[in-house]
């Protein structure tokens, strides 16, 4: 049997009761994860809870890479390390800080400065890549990766205040979405007769019409790959 867990991290912001129960780090509700040590403690508690569920593959959404709000950690890498898994991949929906200039990454992994148009400039000041997106972790080997852009929905203009005051208006742009697929090699006793499984992870838009289009694109791309396939995520 193969166990797949999908989880929206919400950049590991701890909610009420976080860390209670058997987690060694104790109660983390309200913890300030801008501190790297605290951010790692939250990931440690999460790794313990994931371990209790005994999954073989973990599909993650809303994952931070190098963001100040979450201790500037590579959340996917740290979580994979805490789980003792060697196979993982992060795919940025966008590069850049949450509160700054967001941009399309040149390469979704954001593994090196050249993967972001502003990466070389950041490297001059000793700053690594920064982004936000999906990730896939696996206890079993992953022999190939694919990433597909799913686009974004329309921008939204909101008004709070007088209709004749320009300061009353704010423009909110939709978040870019993507599909990350890993080709997972499975032992014979996990799913007899299934040597490989294409596992995809995505996070759809909140607008129904945009989400439907993104889901069609994601599923269509996944089903073109040889072998069985599974799509996980936040729908």
Language model segments and positions:
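N-terminal, active-site-proximal structural segment of metallo-dependent hydrolase catalytic domains
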Residues: 1-131, 197
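Active-site catalytic loop in hydrolytic enzyme cores
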Residues: 116-132, 136-190
């Amino acid at each position: 049997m193969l166990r797949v867990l999908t989880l929206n991290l919400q950049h590991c912001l701890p909610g009420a009761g976080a860390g209670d129960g058997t987690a060694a780090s104790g109660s983390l509700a309200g913890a300030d994860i801008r501190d790297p040590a605290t951010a790692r403690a939250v990931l440690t508690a999460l790794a313990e809870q994931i371990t209790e569920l005994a999954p073989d593959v973990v599909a993650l959404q809303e994952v931070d890479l190098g963001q100040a709000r979450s201790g500037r950690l590579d959340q996917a890498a740290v979580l994979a390390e805490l789980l003792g898994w060697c196979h993982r991949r992060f795919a940025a929906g966008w590069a850049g800080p949450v509160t700054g200039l967001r941009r399309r990454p040149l390469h979704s992994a954001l593994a090196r400065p050249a993967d972001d148009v502003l990466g070389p400039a950041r490297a001059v000041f000793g700053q690594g890549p920064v982004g936000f997106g999906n990730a896939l972790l696996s206890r079993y080997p992953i022999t190939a990766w694919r990433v597909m852009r799913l686009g974004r929905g329309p921008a939204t203009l909101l008004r709070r205040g007088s209709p004749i005051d320009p300061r009353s208006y704010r423009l909110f742009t939709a978040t870019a979405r993507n599909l990350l697929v890993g080709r997972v090699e499975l032992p014979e006793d996990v799913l007899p007769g299934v040597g490989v499984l294409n596992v995809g992870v995505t996070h759809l838009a909140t607008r129904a019409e945009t989400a439907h289009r993104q889901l069609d694109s994601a599923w269509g791309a996944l089903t073109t790959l040889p072998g069985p396939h599974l799509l996980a995520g936040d729908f």
